[in-house]
């Protein structure tokens, strides 16, 4: 397949509509964000430059497709400011529409996904450096965001989000103590959210001898608390 006929970039958002891949935003090697939108036609193996994203340059946004439209949420602008905007793209009119913003701080490295019954958002890191373990659904009828029960584990960002029509699977990522994760979680509207590996307890927090939450570090005594109630003493010598 042909390479993208523009500068290289990272942190772009993407979604697929009608067998066409849409690539939105990103940041190029000089550190500036872009508002470019490209589509790739798998039939003709050709890239097509679409109209630029209406609401400015953006990178590390989250995107998905649902009911014939593309949706995009969060990201950082050209000044590296975290955004909470939510947008939809209509491939018929080739136009973007602003939808109700996310009702909290802007984020990046989050997940936006679609199931049979709508569009959902979860996790990510906000402008204060906090990682999240929450789950939200966009209510199209009420035109609002609704909070749902999140995962009973530490907040996380940058993992892999995969979906079937009925369920979302989320795995790996980095938690709020900067640990690389190998956990897997599954969510469905009928069953809620759970870990497929129920035999493996989930690490909930790490704290020091005084009970203060801390990031994991070598050469000090720490305590790990797990979802099954177990507490482990940890001392790693570097």
Predicted feature descriptions by range:
Residues 1-190:
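Kelch-like beta-propeller repeat domains
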Residues 67, 197, 230-231:
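Generic N-terminal leader/processing signal
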Residues 109, 218-221:
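Short, surface-exposed beta-edge/turn micro-motifs
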Residues 25, 74, 215-217, 235:
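Short linear motifs in exposed loops
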Residues 153-167, 201-216:
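Short cationic/low-complexity microdomains
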Residues 15, 64, 206, 224-225:
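Short aromatic-centered micro-motifs
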Residues 187-214, 237:
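Residue-level detector of functionally pivotal "anchor" positions at catalytic/ligand-binding pockets or at interdomain
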Residues 221-238:
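C-terminal tail/sorting-segment detector
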